[in-house]
Amino acid sequence: MADLLTIEEAQRLILERVRPLPSERVPLDEAAGRVVAEDARAVVDLPPFPSSAMDGFAVRSHDTPGRLPVAARIAAGRPAPRELRPGEAMAIATGGVVPDGADAVIPLEYVVDHDNSVEISEPIAPAAHVRRRGGDLRAGDTVVARGVALGPAQLGALAAAGVAELACGTRPRASVVTTGTELRPPGEQLGPGEVYEANGLILAT
């Protein structure tokens, strides 16, 4: 019997002959399972604006503790109506735009909401519960590096960073060849000592 190659020798011979595949632009919603060919970079800062990490009230931290009038209510997806003035608060939803002038958000659990005013019994630290603009990523930062296979986590991060399409390697074409004199395809009559070939289907699936 001819000498068999070791696994290391087989890997070396294969890698010596491998050539990188060309890349193509792929829409993000068709990129699952593809391999990134160039670093994919954020289109926008993430978050793209200072946002609230909690449902609560945007305040100036030095105005706490105390009872503050509620000047406005900020829903997610809507801009703040104006700058927050000294001595007032604005109700804010998780993900809402923190108004200029505010430097903290105090969660609902820690206040007494009187509809038109809010009672805050403890001081809150500057920057508490505020996600600063670009705190996760800045525009131009690498979101997914070259060579990474795209799964749900990577696709979600790319979508959040505003990436609509990206360069991916073209899909490789491969053939599976199974050998053995004892092998027969399913559906044929087995002879003495023969078995049905199953590994090819497993590898190709």
Task: Describe the residue ranges of each PLM region.
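Short, low-complexity N-terminal leaders and the immediately following helix N-cap/first helix
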Residues: 1-68, 116, 132
